[in-house]
Amino acid sequence: VRDGYIMIKDTNCKFSCNIFKKWEYCSPLCQSKGAETGYCYNFGCWCLDLPDDVPVYGDRGVICRTR
């Protein structure tokens, strides 16, 4: 398992979030990816205890591509 920023599948960009709602959005989103929990950190959803097969922002070769 590992921690990291989960990404939007089509763009490889981080899921953005509201830091004033630290857990409300990110925790359920991270849990849907198999993480224990998650929270908003530096305006992105940071997930704790993700399965190793879930790609995270910063993995080798991962580039955020906006349209």
Swiss-Prot record:
Residues 67 form a propeptide. Disulfide bonds join 13-64, 17-40, 26-45, 30-47. Expressed by the venom gland. The keyword Secreted applies. It is found in: Secreted. InterPro entries: LCN-type_CS_alpha_beta_dom, Scorpion_toxin-like, Scorpion_toxin-like_sf, Scorpion_toxinL, Scorpion_toxinL/defensin. Residues 2-65 form the LCN-type CS-alpha/beta domain. It comes from the Eukaryota. Keywords: Disulfide bond, Ion channel impairing toxin, Neurotoxin, Secreted, Toxin, Voltage-gated sodium channel impairing toxin. GO terms for biological process: defense response. GO terms for cellular component: extracellular region. The keyword Disulfide bond applies. GO terms for molecular function: sodium channel inhibitor activity; toxin activity. Has the structural arrangement of an alpha-helix connected to antiparallel beta-sheets by disulfide bonds (CS-alpha/beta). Belongs to the long (4 C-C) scorpion toxin superfamily. Sodium channel inhibitor family. Alpha subfamily. Alpha toxins bind voltage-independently at site-3 of sodium channels (Nav) and inhibit the inactivation of the activated channels, thereby blocking neuronal transmission. This is Putative sodium channel alpha-toxin Acra5.
